[in-house]
Amino acid sequence: MHCSSPKMVCETKIVADEHDAIHGTKKESILWSSPPSSAPLNPAEAKDVRKDVVFIREFERGDQEEVRRIFYEGIMERIPNTAFRGLWQQPKTQFLYALLTIMCFYMTKSVMLTCCAPLILMGARYYYSRKVIQNYLDCALHTDMADIDAYYMKPTGSCFWVAVLDGRVVGIVAAQGHEDENTVELRRMSVDSRYRGKGIAKALGRRVLEYAMRNNYAGVVLGTTAVKLAAHKLYESLGFRRTGQSEDYRLPGMSRSPLERLFFQIRHTRYRLQLREE
């Protein structure tokens, strides 16, 4: 089941089409091919590859810096999304903030201060979203993302892939096996913001599904705190079904102080794709 065996190597080819995004369409941009060996493309072969073709291959040590950059930038994007857009997913918090604003008026009798109250609340949400997400990012960068080779490439049942376009790493995804549940967990999926909308994320997701099927796992699971609807549509287009949801999820690195609980809330959604009956 080790991911470095020839049977588990993926030289997935993606014809990058700007119009083929994550939506399920009849036009399929992903061409699957099984290479005769696990050797990476040599420079001569790489020159023959069109610039709009992406190859998905296993992680190599030289990818570490770019992989961490893509992961870092992808997580940092969640700060404003969680602080502002995420508020629409928290009706109880909206009610509480409205109540605080009304209380401000009754206590101060100042229209100006009352008008400033929502801005202060939003500023506090941004501050605590940044604080919590940076703490989470620090935890990740000092655990599995600190040594991808040791954490994902060496253990049985785990693997890490990168999507490469014109010699540049543009996307990442990991698979972590859970033998006790006979499932693979899809983790760390992210695509460079400059290359989104080309079907790369969908191809990375399919690579994890292919890995799970080849190794006879019963299902693939994932958990996401993504606020954007596009991320959830991506998982659903791959065949995942929602199995649960937590409205007040605790991220690693959270202190759960009263102020943090007041100004930071995040929804965690769990998905599962059943590959076969056990």
Explain the meaning of each model-derived region.
Residues 1-53:
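Cytosolic, low-complexity regulatory segments enriched in Ser/Pro/Gly with interspersed Lys/Arg
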Residues 9-10, 41, 128, 138-144, ...:
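Conserved catalytic-core motifs of GNAT/GCN5-like acyltransferases
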Residues 12, 75-80, 85-98, 102-187, ...:
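Acetyl-CoA-dependent GNAT
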Residues 55-66, 93-94:
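A short beta-loop-alpha structural element at the N-terminal edge
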Residues 59, 189-191, 224:
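Hydrophobic adenine-recognition pocket in adenosine-nucleotide-binding enzymes
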Residues 68-71, 75:
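Hydrophobic alpha-helical core bundles mediating ligand binding, dimerization, or RNAP-core interactions
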Residues 188-193, 197-214, 233-237:
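Conserved acetyl-CoA-binding loop-helix of GNAT-fold acetyltransferases
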Residues 212-224:
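Conserved GNAT acetyl-CoA-binding A-motif
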